């Protein structure tokens, strides 16, 4: 449940594989990972190549690791990071990426960190609310500062993302179909 990478998340959660690769424009790695109790990482656009991924939004599309443990997700994150001449966004990661992200795992890593939290998202499920409350208490205990984003966020942040997706979708699909050449099932989105 919860997004286009749900199959990948279920496969990891059911121990059918150690790790999987999901794709995300707007929640399709993070939401299924959350729903299936696994780790999902949405890398910055350009850290991983998007070659071969059917596009929805060139400014938001990315692939990312899904795993049962954070360490496994970090290993996969580093294994696939790199420059791809077929994806110009990957040039942005030159000098800003690593082959080993496990080195950044630190049991004291929350100390001094600021973590935003939208309290208005509470109230839909008592058990989930209790788990979130416990997690916030744990993060505070580990030295994190929890910031109530209600006083910062205004409007509807999801709306902007959806507008961008709607704007970029047609051109992205048309370019993807064009790049398929003779193998394309349709010449453009309208024909599709």
Identify the residue ranges that each predicted region occupies.
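Active-site-proximal alpha-helical scaffold in enzymes
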Residues: 1-34, 66-70, 77
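A short helix-breaking turn/cap at a secondary-structure junction
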Residues: 42-130
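Sec-exported extracytoplasmic/periplasmic mature domains
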Residues: 13, 78-85, 140-144, 166, ...
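Short helix-loop-beta junction
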Residues: 128-145
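Short connector loops at secondary-structure junctions
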Residues: 141-160
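Short helix-loop capping/hinge segments that flank enzyme active sites or metal/cofactor-binding pockets
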Residues: 104-118, 167-192
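Glycine/threonine-rich beta-strand-loop-alpha-helix active-site module
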Residues: 25-51
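Structural recognition of the beta-strand scaffold that forms the well-ordered cores
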Residues: 18-22, 30, 39-40, 67, ...
């Amino acid at each position: 449940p919860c997004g286009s990478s749900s199959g990948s998340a279920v496969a990891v959660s059911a121990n059918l594989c150690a790790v999987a690769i999901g794709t995300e424009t707007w929640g399709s790695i993070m939401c299924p990972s959350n729903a299936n109790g696994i780790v999902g990482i949405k890398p910055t656009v350009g850290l991983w190549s998007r070659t071969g991924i059917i596009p929805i939004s060139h400014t938001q599309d990315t692939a990312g690791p899904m795993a049962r443990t954070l360490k496994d997700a970090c290993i996969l994150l580093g294994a696939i990071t790199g420059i791809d001449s077929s994806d110009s966004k990957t040039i942005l990661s030159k000098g800003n990426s690593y082959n080993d992200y496990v080195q950044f795992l630190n049991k004291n890593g929350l100390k001094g960190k600021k973590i935003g939290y939208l309290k208005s998202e509470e109230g839909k499920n008592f058990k989930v609310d209790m788990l979130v409350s416990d997690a916030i208490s744990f993060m505070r205990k580990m030295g994190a500062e929890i910031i109530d984003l209600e006083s910062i966020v205004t409007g509807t942040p999801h709306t902007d993302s959806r507008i961008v997706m709607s704007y970029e979708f047609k051109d992205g699909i048309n370019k993807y179909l064009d790049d398929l050449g003779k193998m394309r099932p349709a010449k453009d989105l309208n024909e599709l």
